[in-house]
Amino acid sequence: MRALYGEISGQSLGGGGTITMQVVRNYVLSFERTYERKLKEIFLAWKLEDLLTKEEIFELYFNKAFLGNRNYGFAAAYQYYFGKDFSEATIAESALLAGILQTPSRVNPVRNPIASKKRRDLILRRMYNRDFISDEQLNLSLIHISEPTRLQQ
């Protein structure tokens, strides 16, 4: 709703809407900036939330999210950046990819490895603070060198 208010008021408030709205936009709608498209997006997002679980919506999102360097979806991005199958991802590598989501151009691990590592470390600390990872996993992940293979060549 914040983005819709911004459009109506003429102020850009940023933000791409909820994850469900982004799934609708990525799979169903165009990226044109019109009130009609935004209203369709909101309506379809409500419908989608009735049909799918949060986990199913997240899976759709992660399979189509833009992760820089022409990579869409975590599996493709992991293959591109690390040269391995996503099933082999470490916590540190997954956090690095998750860090790209917010601003792919600014935290691109190939073009800006320092910003990418800072963002990765922030995500790891948030994961720890929310009890998703243990103290040991945090410390091991912070020292893990999750440098993309693209930089090693």
Give each language-model segment a name:
Residues I145-Q153:
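A short, hydrophobic C-terminal helix/tail in secreted or cell-surface proteins
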